[in-house]
Amino acid sequence: MKIYYIGVFRSPAEQSSDEKALELTEVKDLSQFGFFERNSVGQFMTFFAETVATRTTAGQRQSVEEGNYIGHVYARSEGICGVLITDKDYPVRPAYTLLNKVLDEYLVAHPADQWKSITATNDSLKMAELSTYISKYQDPAQADAIMKVQQELDETKIVLHKTIENVLQRGEKLDNLVDKSESLTASSKMFYKQAKKTNSCCIIM
């Protein structure tokens, strides 16, 4: 069981607009990937998280399966969205318990007036505790312990998607989003295409 990524995003103001979710803070654990793969894999985790955060409406929880990975996404009514990327073995309930904890704490530390109108994130919006959490909560039992002080999670309200294609808008293709992405370097785009051809398990897509 493994957590690879925890991130907090500002949700788009309107779901129908071209605005993307804005990553406010994140942490990654790429230790299981080869040294030369880590940069490209890290970029794709951010790209994947941004893509699903942009397409998750306020109040919605959805888990998006892609390859060997699952992105757990929770968009809050306050205008922020949490994303947790794990392997397929990490249980759903602890994943959302951790996301809820992260978002609760983020809103206390960073009220909406700090990030509602910004055009780019900055270091003042980071959440240092994420580094602790991505280590501590590799053990799902630790996250389950939070349940004692949080309300019960209704797992039936979590939407499970078998592939990221299911959350894309009609007519959108993942390959096209990769090509148009400004957050991915040319080498990472090439890495994605090669990994897709070989069905490599070392890449997030």
UniProtKB/Swiss-Prot annotation:
Signal peptide residue numbers: none
Residue ranges of domain Longin in the record: 7-131
Proregion positions: 203-205
Compartment(s): Cell membrane
Lipid-attached positions, S-palmitoyl cysteine: C201
Any GO MF annotation of the entry: SNAP receptor activity
Domain v-SNARE coiled-coil homology: 145-205
Cellular component terms (Gene Ontology): autophagosome membrane; endosome; extracellular region; fungal-type vacuole; Golgi apparatus; plasma membrane; SNARE complex
Lipid bilayer topology: Lipid-anchor
One GO BP: vacuole fusion, non-autophagic
Modified residues (Cysteine methyl ester): C202
Keywords: Cell membrane, Coiled coil, Lipoprotein, Membrane, Methylation, Palmitate, Prenylation
Highest taxon of the lineage: Eukaryota
SMART domains per record: Longin (SM01270)
InterPro entries: Longin-like_dom_sf (IPR011012), Longin_dom (IPR010908), R-SNARE_YKT6 (IPR045848), Synaptobrevin-like (IPR001388), V_SNARE_CC (IPR042855)
Lipidated residue numbers (S-farnesyl cysteine): C202
Pfam families for this protein: Longin, Synaptobrevin
Keyword Ribosomal protein: no
Record family assignment: Belongs to the synaptobrevin family.
Protein name: Synaptobrevin homolog YKT6
Gene of this entry: YKT6
